[in-house]
């Protein structure tokens, strides 16, 4: 009776089943003999075949949706070799996917999808940061955090850097806001380890690589030499190719490789960049890095019109601007109405005006003075609306870049129900960007679309977005008409690129010949045939002779729960989700939910998804809200999951939750006794190492003269500080001591036992129990604080966040221990025992409270060096969920453990006991509260 009832979480029945719903065969999973063949080739643990597996991989950031028949999960290069050889024998197409942020359908298939993210996350910094060696599943943002200490970064910097993976960036030849053609993957990839369609493995950096390539793939090598000679002999075509690639261009294959390299393998290595996984698999790449100044100065300069804005770009670039981003007035006006913090005056901008976001970067602040002054002189006398003002304030800079990078989320927030977003990008020669922008606005207006544009002005690269409901035939016709007019304008008038940075994909494959002409396109078809004679690598993704393929397999977006219905499936949530390498991500939880909503109530697919959703989506969700911070429209998928947990509880479970709330004081005593008497048994039962019990008595304090009320979290009232409590103080002992030492003593009420923030109930969906506890704690806080006269300090960030989020604590100041120490104690304490290096883990709740920088500042007072691992994120513990599902923290923290491996530190600190326990278990290092480290460092 206490088990979940999955029938209670079935979505609302649609008025009519969606035309693009998953077919009934999906209910049984991967069909035979495909399933058996894949398992034989790779092994059962490397193949996903259930209904939920297929549906969760059907969606990516593009407007397309194809349901794969199976998902392969290779762990290493040997697995990929086995996979491509099996695919070649069976003529089974493969499509590789890393981050799933591609926008044009290039990571979509109805055959076998190959996940090269989950087990492909190794990276190594080389030559003092001058180069990096990375696997395809490594996040760009993670690599850049590792490089930051060297003042370097990867060249490509797409807006999706925090979720885009190295493999996808190379596959699409992605660019970005500060990335010209000189810094894109084509220019910065120095070597690769490739798996050819035959299964041959070639390291292009090996001394004998050319010879091995010629031996392993003689027809390919000879064919590339033939095409090289043919292209070079055709002066008109070779000049056109050279000209086309002077600007950003990701349409088709990079024929410039035949002009830039002489030998077959070097030509092929260059062709693989931007080939979208259709010529070979990149198992590893070495990339050159570029310098990146640690300090920035930014201004958003509004101009009277687009011409004036564009005219200022070249001089600003000559003055050293690292970025010059063009935004037209409709974009800024929409931002002003929908983005908090944007200037009020943007709402009244004239429609014909435009703005340029200008950024300068330098290694030290003084070096920004000269370019700032040069920029002001350049802008003086031009048709600017407001006097230009540069800022170096991090918060202001973040807001300005948020406007530029937040276009995706901005339109998602106002997206009509059922509409999808399509992101387009084109490129023209930079000197014609103003003219092209006006023409593009006219084309958009002609077809009834918002004429909002933004782009990398110095590169002539313009981006725009479309909102369409593909369930409406008129929207499909409108989109098709727009694309054809766009092609006529960009290619016919400007000889530009129909895709500058986003890759070709099924969205633009039908238009490759329109841009390149029959002769160049035929050479591309020859390249594909030479590299992939069996046609197993992403067929139809870059080259496709089927007209209208860009109008097929467009996904519907059925309404689901309000908290998640605005999701555009961009995937920005995925890197911060602790279950991303175990079960599902927030994007996938929502995508599967939408598939349920597409199905009729008696559908076997719906039933299969409901049954599998319980563990895959509900039980293994940490519900910590990290996804909301990363999401462009602030969707907290944890709230969706918690709402589903409430719905699936039967009455006996709800009563049990209320009973626990009413007798929580007794439960505390039982828990401590269990830890003292049966810690070993409990650890074995939970498959986790448990700490010692906390002392039965809390430290002695008095109310008189207290500067704050101290509510020790139930975590710290139950769990002690590990098995070395005799050596180190407990958290309550340490906080009482440092508060007294700083002249700000705290008082612990004698009746704190039995009081809790309520998070254990709300996170599990026990609403009645949470309400009971919330009422009790709110009353106690009011009484203890003398009606709000004294602040209340709590020593676990999740509990502080819970009190503020769940209880509300109206009129009472609730302070996390980080804020208490940083704002009230730190300046009154003397560090007498300084540490060398301290590792800091900012946990989810502290991050939500905006306290991560304060935690780092406290650590900086204690130590010569503070390190926050580049892989830091949610630990996956989520209260007790990590004990119930130890696979969560084990997976969430694996990259942190790798980063710390083999190094020594004086202390590892955080601000939440269960997070510290998870970190200890996975990394093998002792983690404790920062308060303990502070107390020990400030002792006499």
What is the predicted role of each segment?
Residues 38, 62-94, 112, 116-159, ...:
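N-terminal glycine-rich flavin-associated loop
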Residues 535-541, 572-595, 620-647, 802, ...:
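Iron-sulfur cluster-binding cysteine motifs and their immediate structural context
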Residues 512-514, 549-569, 600-623:
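Ferredoxin-like iron-sulfur electron-transfer modules
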Residues 48-57, 257-265, 269-481, 489, ...:
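C-terminal substrate-recognition/cap domain of FAD-linked oxidoreductases
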Residues 1-85, 89, 101-130, 207, ...:
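N-terminal flexible segment immediately upstream of the FAD-binding catalytic core
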Residues 166-261, 265-336, 350-356, 580-602, ...:
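Mobile "lid/hinge" segments at catalytic clefts and subdomain interfaces of large enzymes
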Residues 532, 637-940:
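Iron-sulfur cluster-binding electron-transfer modules in prokaryotic oxidoreductases
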Residues 543, 549, 580-616, 634-659, ...:
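Non-heme iron-sulfur electron-transfer modules
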